């Protein structure tokens, strides 16, 4: 079973991915993990990717696709895989189809965990940290006993720049703009299944299982 998992930051994609790979016994393959493994392994493509990353530049598609090809050629993908964070563009999706064809494989399902951006903003802006001890809180999921104060040492909590509302909204806008052509691409191919992610985790996963079917 070969899957692509899509969803905005905070939509619960990681949670669903963990449940899928545990039940279906397929590897969870993220772009970051692939890059780190290639770099750690000192592969030619890994070295090439590192040279771009060290300069703060985007890794070109041809390098990324090469690393994806290497990863999907490994033995643990024989029964399937779950791709997370790749592809990000239609060009990458087309390249993925081509390389899978070369490997005698194809995408079975593209699962899009859909949650409205306005629901995601509070989830993504709710994290506050203690600058003294590093304790992490979330105003919805793990609030401190006293608002704005660390339970451990009484320090005033702070919010990282990445977690501020303006930054979060900008990041979501970019993700929505980038993902729309990809969603349209997979919808036209007939692979796309969009699930409502604004429900309890187990309810969403029940829909995922209904889509994917029983384990073999």
Swiss-Prot record:
PROSITE patterns: ADENYLATE_KINASE
Region feature LID, mapped onto this chain: 126-163
CDD domains for this protein: ADK (cd01428)
UniProt-annotated location(s): Cytoplasm
Catalytic activity: AMP + ATP = 2 ADP
Keyword Kinase included in the entry's annotation: yes
Enzyme class: transferase
Quaternary structure annotation from Swiss-Prot or TrEMBL: Monomer.
Protein known as: Adenylate kinase
């Amino acid at each position: 079973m070969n899957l692509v998992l899509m969803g905005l930051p905070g939509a619960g994609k990681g949670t669903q991915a963990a449940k899928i790979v545990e039940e279906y016994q397929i590897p969870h393959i993220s772009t970051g993990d692939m890059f780190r493994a290639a770099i750690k392994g000192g592969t030619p493509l890994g070295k090439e990717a590192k040279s771009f990353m060290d300069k703060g530049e985007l890794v070109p598609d041809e390098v990324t696709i090469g690393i994806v090809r290497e990863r999907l050629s490994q033995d643990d993908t024989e029964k399937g895989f779950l791709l997370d964070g790749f592809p990000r563009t239609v060009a990458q999706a087309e390249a993925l189809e081509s390389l899978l064809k070369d490997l005698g494989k194809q995408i079975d399902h593209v699962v899009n965990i859909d949650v409205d951006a306005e629901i995601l903003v509070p989830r993504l802006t709710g994290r506050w940290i203690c600058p003294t001890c590093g304790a992490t809180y979330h105003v919805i999921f793990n609030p401190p006993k006293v608002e704005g104060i660390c339970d451990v040492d009484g320090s005033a909590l702070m919010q990282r720049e990445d977690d501020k509302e303006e930054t979060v909204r900008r990041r979501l806008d970019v993700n929505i703009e980038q993902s729309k052509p990809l969603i349209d691409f997979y919808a036209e191919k007939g692979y796309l299944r969009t699930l409502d992610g604004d429900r309890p985790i187990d309810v969403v996963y029940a829909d995922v299982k209904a889509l994917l079917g029983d384990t073999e």
